Amino acid sequence: HHIVDLCKRFSVPEPSPDSSCLYQDFGGFELRWERHTEFANFTFICPDVEAFSADALTFVPKDWLADMPGELVVAVNLVLTGEEPDEKKLYQWFEGQRVSGAWIADRKAQVWTAFKLHSDGFGRMVACNRGLTPYQAGRLVQRLFELETYRLMSLMSLPVARKMSHELGPIEDSLATLNQSISDIGAEKDERVLLQELSLLAAEVERHRSNTNFRFSASVAYHDLVRDRLNQLREEPIDGMQSLREFLERRLTPGIKTCNSVRDRLEDLSWRILRTTSMLRTRVDLSIQAQNQHL
């Protein structure tokens, strides 16, 4: 509905209700819109705008932007230029932040980014075309946007993982205490109480698993997409500068490992509770059989 509203304002053809993409010239800017499973992206394209002093959003109605539904996850300004910027220009554009960069596509392009937000609230990327066709340049821009989008989407599970890591400690301690109690069992009543406590622990772990499973699985999938886009870029190093891959390996991979570690802890806890419950049920059954035989 939001896209349709924009189209009506500029008197351009609207997408059909079941459309998942739109590419349209709005006069002062072009818009590429795509709807994905978890998010939608809006790419506003404007030619001949001075780098990072203005952007394509200048031409978009402010009230329309303010009313956009959902939560903002990724905001990036990308400049495509034909002239290689010198160190002074890069320092100015990236506001003194440490920049990662590389030669791309068999040295037909160069890209630079700081992978950080800048004073305008946007991330920044610069791509210098050194021999790409218009189609290839468009594909490069698309891959760079996807790289940043999938990078940030993959990290959405990190706060969940950190919170869950703190919550799993007490559950693991409770299970250890229950296992110790099982070794000290004397009466049938104790066994039944322990089974009930195990059942409550199992329910808590399963609740955590169901609440986090989608987020953790999505994180792995997005991380795979990041690596895929990196491979498609075919990076070659720029002297004295860390590559995009080096930055992502150093900053993104540990976060993904944290998420995978917490997910593995959850799976391990679930299996250990199941095994303990099974052993305890066997003891209860044997105890009941012994009582029946005695009777």
Describe the predicted segments one by one:
Residues 3-8, 58, 62-66, 138-145, ...:
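Generic detector of well-ordered alpha-helical segments enriched in charged/polar residues
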Residues 1-82:
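N-terminal pre-transmembrane cytosolic regions of membrane proteins
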Residues 45-203:
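Extended alpha-helical interaction modules
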Residues 12-20, 94-97, 122-131, 222-229:
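Short, mixed-charge, low-aromatic patches
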Residues 202-295:
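Membrane-associated alpha-helical segments
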Residues 25-30, 107-114, 219:
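Short small/polar-residue motifs
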Residues 38-40, 121-123, 257, 264:
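Structural beta-strand/beta-sheet cores of well-ordered domains, especially the beta-sheet scaffolds
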